[in-house]
């Protein structure tokens, strides 16, 4: 009896999924695009399985060992050639299928966030397995949908005799804005003719924000320890240097632009009050709407750090962990994604799924609106820059790139939180991932079969960049900041 019940639940879930996707099949599609859509629907159970496995793993940045292995193994079993451990990162990989041009890339992310793990329930509750990290940004869905789209495109291309190369980029450590920066520096996107991406969200919309360029850097100060009371004159306080630097930066805030964002923490400040701290460290982010502005403020802060070292008779060292550009939008690709998002439609959430979302909102004392089920029109002009930064921006300055969001979490709940982790471990979240996989597969097939679209995207890219080659914000010899221990 137990076995029959289990089969029945799976059958009902798959039947519901097929009903939910029938409207998109009824539209007039080319044979190649119909093949891509059919292949994605056939892969829906596999996408769900991947998404749930990644949710269970919930491995944090550059520690995504099981997650990367799972996705790379699936692609390899499907016939993709997989290069693992690229760009000096053990959990980064590139999977390719096909030959010749065009080379169309899809980005996959799979890292989790520390401290936001939660059971897939509409209230704060720890996971039974004790894992405290969680998919508060939905990268379990991101990775599963992107790999699913790559598999669907491979099958459709083989069935239809479509030429070209499909490329799936396994990009770790998006949450620390690291993975794609080092992959870009290694030249891994250089031969791609276009790249597509998506992200879980609380709306259904094509990305139309540039985001902010950013530098993420650490400043270490080295002084001399001494007894804080018996002989402080023999000490040189590294903590004094950090505080003096921070004070200088806080005075600087009056004289930067309204678009500038500067934030810091002090991860190391000394060991005990009765010891003059011989080591201290400040960790900074500086952001603005373009790379040039970030560099200007960064240079100023470095001078403040130098002055703080001089004023406290300490030594200092700066480490630029990572840096990114603002997102370089591509209108032709945006329009193609918008058309295919409208073709596929939004996730068809059930009454029970909407009730889950509303219960979660009620728990958080947020208006009980449930999941968003509208598609936002693509505006003629870019939206104002968001506060965040993304390493996808580096790809967007190498090749035409565009992305979109699909609803995977209840509206207005805090992002990067236990609440979004809960949503991303449900079938409602998976529905969003499957919609995303379809949009990626359809747009990917557009790029393989519509030479005018690809040419238009590339021409637009050349206009936006002025024909200038991509320059990494990082020193050419810098290696990725790999973790020293394994943790979730």
Language model segments and positions:
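Metal-dependent amide/peptide-bond hydrolase catalytic core
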Residues: 27, 243-488
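Histidine/acidic-residue-rich, glycine-tolerant segments that coordinate divalent metal ions
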Residues: 124-134, 140-141, 157-277, 287
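Bacterial N-terminal signal peptides that target proteins for export
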Residues: 1-13
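Divalent metal-coordination and catalytic microenvironments
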Residues: 54, 75, 95, 106, ...
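Glycine/charged-rich beta-loop-alpha catalytic/anionic-binding loops adjacent to active sites
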Residues: 120-136, 222-226, 376-378, 417-426
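N-terminal signal peptide c-region/cleavage motif recognized by signal peptidases
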Residues: 21-23
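Sec/Tat-exported extracytoplasmic proteins
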Residues: 43-47, 51, 55-58, 79, ...
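Acidic/His- and Gly-rich active-site-bordering loop/insert found
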Residues: 27-135, 144-165
């Amino acid at each position: 009896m137990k076995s029959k019940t289990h089969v029945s639940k799976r059958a009902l879930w798959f039947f519901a999924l097929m009903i939910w996707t029938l409207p998109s099949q009824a539209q007039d599609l080319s044979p190649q695009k119909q093949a891509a859509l059919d292949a994605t629907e056939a892969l829906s159970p596999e996408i769900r399985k991947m998404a749930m496995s990644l949710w269970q793993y919930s491995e944090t940045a550059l520690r995504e060992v099981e997650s990367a292995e799972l996705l790379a193994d699936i692609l390899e079993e499907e016939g993709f050639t997989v290069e693992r451990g690229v760009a000096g990162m053990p959990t980064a990989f590139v999977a390719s299928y096909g030959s010749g041009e065009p080379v169309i890339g899809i980005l996959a992310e799979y890292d989790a966030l520390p401290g936001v793990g939660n059971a897939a329930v509409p209230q704060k509750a720890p996971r039974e397995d004790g894992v405290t990290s969680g998919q508060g940004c939905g990268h379990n869905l991101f990775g599963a949908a992107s790999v699913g789209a790559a598999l669907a495109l491979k099958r459709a291309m083989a069935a239809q005799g479509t030429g070209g190369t499909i490329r799936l980029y396994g990009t770790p450590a998006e949450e620390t804005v690291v993975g794609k920066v080092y992959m870009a520096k290694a030249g891994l996107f250089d031969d791609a003719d276009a790249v597509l991406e998506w992200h879980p969200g609380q709306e259904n919309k094509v990305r139309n924000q540039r985001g902010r360029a950013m530098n993420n850097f650490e400043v270490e100060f080295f002084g001399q320890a001494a007894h804080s009371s018996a002989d402080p004159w023999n000490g040189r306080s590294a903590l004094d240097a950090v505080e003096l630097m921070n004070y200088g930066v806080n005075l600087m805030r009056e004289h930067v632009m309204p678009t500038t964002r500067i934030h810091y923490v002090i991860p190391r400040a000394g060991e005990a009050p009765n010891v003059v701290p011989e080591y201290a460290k400040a960790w900074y982010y500086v952001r603005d709407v373009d790379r040039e502005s970030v560099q200007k403020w960064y240079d100023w802060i470095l001078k403040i750090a130098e002055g703080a070292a001089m004023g406290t008779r300490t030594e200092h060292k700066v480490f630029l962990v990572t840096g990114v550009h603002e997102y370089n939008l591509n209108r032709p690709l945006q329009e193609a994604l918008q058309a295919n998002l409208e073709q596929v439609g939004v996730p068809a959430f059930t009454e029970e799924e909407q009730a889950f979302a509303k219960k979660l909102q009620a728990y958080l004392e947020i208006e009980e609106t449930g999941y968003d089920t509208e598609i936002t029109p693509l505006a003629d002009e870019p939206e104002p820059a968001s506060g965040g930064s993304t390493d996808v921006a580096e790809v967007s300055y190498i090749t035409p790139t565009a992305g979109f969001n699909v609803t995977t979490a209840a509206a207005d709940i805090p992002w990067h939180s236990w609440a979004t982790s809960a949503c991303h471990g449900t079938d409602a979240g998976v529905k969003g991932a499957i919609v995303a996989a379809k949009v990626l597969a359809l747009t990917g097939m557009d790029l393989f079969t519509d030479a005018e679209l690809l040419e238009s995207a590339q021409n637009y890219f050349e206009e936006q960049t002025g024909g200038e080659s991509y320059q990494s914000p990082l020193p050419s010899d810098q290696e990725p900041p790999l973790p020293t221990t394994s943790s979730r």
